[in-house]
From Swiss-Prot:
Residues 1-20 form the signal peptide. CDD domains: PBP2_Maltodextrin. This is Maltotriose-binding protein. It comes from the Archaea. The lineage of its organism: Archaea, Methanobacteriati, Methanobacteriota, Thermococci, Thermococcales. PANTHER family: MALTOSE-BINDING PERIPLASMIC PROTEIN, MALTOSE_MALTODEXTRIN-BINDING PERIPLASMIC PROTEIN. Belongs to the bacterial solute-binding protein 1 family. Residues 29-52 have a biased composition (Low complexity). It comes from Pyrococcus furiosus (strain ATCC 43587 / DSM 3638 / JCM 8422 / Vc1). GO terms for biological process: maltodextrin transmembrane transport; maltose transport. The gene is malE.
């Protein structure tokens, strides 16, 4: 997910333009074609194991989404499996290309769906606007423990649960196996690889790494700093640990990179074989495969400093199935959503067919998942990710962080990084208050 969704957030993402973020599907993808508005599914024969475990509701459950056609196909297939197990329930998917606007218009008038699918970045603003239905009565400690910690955090806002998680994404190192025989296990090993391949005279570089708030969050937050504290709802650019992270990036990594930090340029450098490694997310894998690169995926390695180990903490996003306020069939919707997000076979299907990174912890130990280098590699990276903030106030932070980065990039070697970050800290605070 790049942060077009986070500026949408962002990352990202943020993934939506890649400028400030990485993207998160469901929330990260913009459909390239519109599916029929309403798509009920058909049924197929259930397996005996599933029949013994499933909880069934009855009636219709309507799910709004803005998925890509290939994503929708897989979700419909899973819904068909569920309806075969539960013949009294009907799962209906409705395509809404402008999903946010559609939800904001429909839910207050009682015309919204039961469920909708998007990334976790909406949970704060939608909860604040009264557009979500709490599911506290259904959520148990045992259920929570089935999910990775980041996913547990993503599904709640200010003490209430509003959604269930089914996938995550973050950035990791994608490396060219023809150039890197053993991926780096520490930052020192990573730096040695960068030094080996850095040859700017021949337009070859040590690493490809897009430069924006989302992508460098891993290092900016590695030493305990942060852009924004979701609990206190305060920015942290002026924290010593954040300043240390920025200084580390621009003194230890930037010198081995091409001088242009935009996403497309950095990705092209790796795809053309002009860098041994790239920092990117699962959304980039199709391009890597098309380039014919023999690649692997591993988490960004820990930085060893003063005898301590500091893991890079890139922002991560979680894909959720939300419960809409005014839900018409809450019991049936809960039972389907719980099945979808906790069934090992369902989550494996999403992972193996769509490349979704599981947050159902028991699936990460599945042999098929472990043998998939992309899914397993990003899955390990998710364990070190820092959940992208959920507070609506985060919207004021992205621009400030990118502003600081752009000012540093004017002269990275001589920039007053501490002074610049403190300047933009105050700018963010002013924007939050104004």
């Amino acid at each position: 997910m790049r942060r077009a969704t986070y500026a949408f957030a962002l990352l990202a993402i943020l993934v939506l333009g890649v400028v400030a973020s990485g993207c998160i599907g469901g929330g990260t993808t913009t459909p390239t074609q519109t599916s029929p508005a309403t798509q009920p599914t058909t049924t197929q024969t259930p397996t005996q194991t599933e029949t013994q475990a499933v909880e069934c509701g009855s009636g219709k459950v309507v799910i709004w989404h803005a998925m890509q056609p290939n994503e929708l196909e897989v979700f419909q297939s899973l819904a068909e499996e569920y309806m075969a197990l539960c013949p009294e329930v009907e799962i209906v998917f409705e395509q809404k290309p402008n999903l946010e606007d559609a939800l904001k218009a429909a839910i207050p008038t009682g015309q919204g769906p039961d469920l909708f699918i998007w990334a976790h970045d909406w949970i704060g603003k939608f909860a604040e606007a009264g557009l979500l239905e709490p599911i506290d009565e259904y959520v148990t400690e045992d259920l929570l423990n089935e999910f990775a910690p980041m996913a547990q955090d993503a599904m709640q806002y200010k003490g209430h649960y509003y959604a269930l998680p089914f996938a995550a994404e973050t950035v990791a190192i994608i490396y060219n196996k023809e150039m890197v025989s053993e991926p780096p296990k520490t930052f020192d090993e990573m730096k040695a690889i960068m030094e080996k391949y850095y040859d700017p005279a021949n337009e070859k570089y040590g690493i490809a790494w897009p430069i924006n708030a989302y992508f460098i969050s891993a290092i900016a937050q590695a030493f305990g700093g942060y852009y924004f504290d979701d609990k206190t709802e305060q920015p942290g650019l002026d924290k010593p640990e954040t300043i240390e992270g920025f200084k580390f990036f621009f003194t230890e990594i930037w010198p081995y990179m091409a001088p242009t930090g935009d996403y497309n340029t950095q990705q092209s450098i790796f795809l053309e074989g002009r860098a041994p490694m790239m920092v990117n997310g699962p959304w980039s894998i199709n391009d890597v495969k098309k380039a014919g690169i023999n690649f692997g995926v591993v988490p960004l390695p820990p930085i060893i400093k003063d005898g301590k180990e500091y893991w890079p903490r890139p922002y991560g996003g979680v894909k959720l199935i939300y419960f809409a306020a005014g839900i018409k069939n809450k019991d049936a919707a809960w039972k389907f959503a719980k099945w979808l997000t906790t069934s090992e076979e369902s989550i494996k299907t999403l992972a193996l067919e769509l490349g979704y990174i599981p947050v159902l912890t028991k699936v990460l130990d599945d042999p098929e998942i472990k043998n998939d280098p992309v899914i397993y590699g990003f899955g390990q990276a998710v364990q070190h990710a820092y959940l992208m903030p959920k507070s609506p106030k985060m919207s004021a932070v992205w621009g400030g962080v990118d502003g600081a980065i752009n000012e540093i990039l004017q002269d990275p070697q001589n920039a007053d990084i501490e002074g610049i970050l403190k300047k933009y800290q105050q700018e963010i605070l002013n924007n939050m208050q104004g």
